[in-house]
């Protein structure tokens, strides 16, 4: 299952709760130059949504992304 973690940087206050509560915290989350967190490697995310649930400003959205099939474009001419 592939996921996309979207952080609204306008809403993020840089509290670090997403990082702290995430079972894979250091593998997924990092800070930008303004001290706000973002997900830089979602490969390790298993969609527990702890980060979104703990965010005090609701700045985190997690979307399940369906991977494209390899043969999806082969039959189109």
Curated annotation (Swiss-Prot):
UniProt keyword list: 4Fe-4S, Electron transport, Iron, Iron-sulfur, Metal-binding, Repeat, Transport
Q: Where does [4Fe-4S] cluster 2 bind?
A: 45, 48, 51, 55
The residues that the entry says bind [4Fe-4S] cluster 1 are 12, 15, 18, 22
Tell me the cofactor note: Binds 2 [4Fe-4S] clusters.
Domain 4Fe-4S ferredoxin-type, chain residue ranges per copy: 3-32, 36-65
Q: Which cofactor does it need?
A: [4Fe-4S] cluster
MF GO annotations:
4 iron, 4 sulfur cluster binding; metal ion binding; oxidoreductase activity
Q: What does this protein do?
A: Ferredoxins are iron-sulfur proteins that transfer electrons probably in the CO-dehydrogenase complex.
PANTHER family with a match to the protein in the record: FERREDOXIN SUBUNIT OF PYRUVATE:FLAVODOXIN OXIDOREDUCTASE-RELATED, IRON-SULFUR-BINDING PROTEIN
Protein name, as recorded: Uncharacterized ferredoxin MJ0722
């Amino acid at each position: 299952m592939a996921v996309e973690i979207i952080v609204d940087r306008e809403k993020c206050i840089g509290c670090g709760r997403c990082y702290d509560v995430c079972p894979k915290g250091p593998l997924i989350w990092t800070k930008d130059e303004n001290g706000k967190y973002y997900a830089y490697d979602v490969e390790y995310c298993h969609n527990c949504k702890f980060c979104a649930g703990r965010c005090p400003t609701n700045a985190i959205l997690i979307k399940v992304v369906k991977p494209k099939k390899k043969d999806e474009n082969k039959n189109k001419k």
